[in-house]
């Protein structure tokens, strides 16, 4: 994966959790969010299984010293669901669920 990143070649997105070997292969996760996940201690997609997306979001806010856009939480929700075996879905499919579950951030 490091060779792909350094060469500027994008990682293909995984269709299934079992095929996901690098954070950048997660649907909806690009280099910036992959770096954010690494910053909070997530280095491999499998580490997202059974994680609390809100805790990841809050950890990233603390690590950066800035409030992250709520769509980051939507994206973390999508990634955790995907690694739990769900089909890939766009992050914005989680916006209504996030608002209902967590209210205003």
Enumerate the predicted regions with their spans.
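C-terminal extensions
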Residues: 1-27, 31-105
